[in-house]
A protein has these predicted regions:
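Catalytic phosphate/nucleotide-handling subdomain of diverse soluble enzymes
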Residues: 65, 69-71, 76-89, 205-209, ...
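Active-site cavity-forming subdomains of large catalytic enzyme subunits
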Residues: 53, 61, 111, 116-215, ...
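Helix-termini ("caps") and immediately adjacent flexible loops/tails
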Residues: 38-53, 85, 97-98, 106-108, ...
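Mature N-terminal segment immediately following signal peptide/propeptide cleavage
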Residues: 47-70
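Active-site-surrounding "flap" and adjacent substrate/cofactor-binding loops of secreted or lumenal enzymes
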Residues: 72-103, 109-112, 129-135, 139-143
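Beta-strand segments within the central parallel beta-sheet cores of soluble alpha/beta enzyme folds
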Residues: 128-136, 195-200, 232-239, 315-320, ...
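Bacterial Sec-dependent N-terminal signal peptides
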Residues: 1-40
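Accessory "access/gating" subregions that flank catalytic or transport cores
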Residues: 47, 153, 162-171, 182-190, ...
Length: 358
């Protein structure tokens, strides 16, 4: 936690919106993407710069708030949900306090910012090695797949080999999934372009299901710009993932269980626990209830989005109460929802802590 300073984080945060908005606006003006024909999504879409700004800000704000909300519970509930009678604190000043005393909690965000900064310096065609060197030499702490990839890069194993399971035992972990937000926020309404960005950057630290998690999250963010229907965003984004993959099958199960148990997220959690709670890759989780695998944790993101029904608190709370990586999961869910709804629609209760660090 002491390897990234608050000053560095705040400096990077100030450049974020400028870069993201400029990139997104440029992509909109120079790229046209043909989506799979569907009755669910518009074939053309127009968005004002004001609305674009509101959605981009919403994505980053939602992610930051979600991390802070779930932070106190992170990996304290392993293969166990957080029961309703257990309070989850969102104390006054908590985000500022985390910024000062536990900035490593925000690895979801400062990894995104590193990649954004590379785009700013080198443009949208920046080579993959530039992203790899940027985070490998950055002065902040890393864990699991990110840490293993850093070690690989510093020892001459460059991407995509740095993220491959032969060189990285954490290849299926959640790492790129929690830092892929930028890919969707920079490609509004263009999930295929978001996936292209993820193909380049996501393989620095992940492969297989770990990579699919980031592709899926990025696609949901991208589609959040052109659809206000959470069910459509969740289902259409899944088309970016191979149907025969374990990741796709799990997310599809969650969607089906939501239809079967529309008012009972805990039943869906139990079904998911029985069928999908195996972490066979991460050395820390193989023989323990600890599970940092991208599959189960992304299932918790989807559960929050579907059962949250557009309510900011409910969405975060469900993703958090599913347990395991319970700060990253509400961060993803809240970020996607706030991209759909916009920064201006985040309830004041959640904004007051964020404003202290804006």
């Amino acid at each position: 936690f002491n390897t990234i300073t608050l000053k560095t984080y705040l400096m990077m945060n100030k450049i974020l919106l400028f870069l993201a908005i400029g990139f997104a606006t440029g992509m909109l003006s120079c790229s046209q993407q043909t989506l799979e024909k569907t009755d669910s999504l518009p074939q053309t879409y127009t968005i004002s710069q004001e609305r674009l700004l509101d959605k981009i800000k919403g994505g980053w704000a939602g992610q930051t708030i979600g991390v802070a909300y779930g932070g106190p519970t992170e990996f304290r509930y392993r293969s166990a949900m957080i029961q309703d009678y257990v309070p989850i604190s969102y104390a006054d000043g908590c985000i500022k306090n985390y910024f000062k005393h536990a900035p490593g909690l925000f690895d979801d965000i400062y990894m995104d910012l590193t990649f954004v900064e590379v785009f700013d310096r080198l443009g949208i065609d920046a080579p993959v090695d530039s992203f790899a060197h940027a985070f490998a030499h950055a002065d902040y702490g890393l864990w699991h797949a990110n840490q293993a990839a850093r070690y690989n890069i510093l020892n001459g194993i460059m991407p995509p080999a740095s993220g491959h399971w032969l060189n990285n035992p954490h290849a299926d972990d959640i790492d790129y999934q929690i830092e892929a937000d930028f890919a969707g926020l920079m490609t509004p309404g263009m999930p295929n372009t978001a996936s292209e960005i993820s193909d380049k950057i996501g393989h620095i630290m992940n492969y297989g299901d770990g990579w699919y998690g980031g592709v899926y999250i990025g696609a949901m963010y991208s589609l959040a710009f052109i659809s206000d229907d959470i069910n459509i965003v969740v289902q259409e984004a899944l088309k970016t993932i191979p149907e025969n993959s374990r990741f796709h099958q799990c997310m599809n199960d969650v969607i089906q269980w939501h239809r079967q148990y529309p008012n009972d997220w805990k039943q869906t959690w139990a079904e998911c626990e029985k069928k999908w709670n195996q972490d066979i890759g991460c050395p820390e989780g193989t023989l323990l209830p600890y599970n940092i695998d991208a599959v189960i944790n992304c299932a918790y993101v989807v559960m929050g989005l579907l059962y949250g029904e557009g309510d900011f608190y409910k969405t975060m709370d469900i993703s958090t109460r599913c347990g395991q990586d319970s700060d990253c999961n509400p961060a993803s869910a809240a970020g996607i929802l706030a991209t759909i709804q916009g920064y201006s629609q985040i309830p004041e209760y959640w904004m007051k802590n964020l404003r202290e660090v804006e």
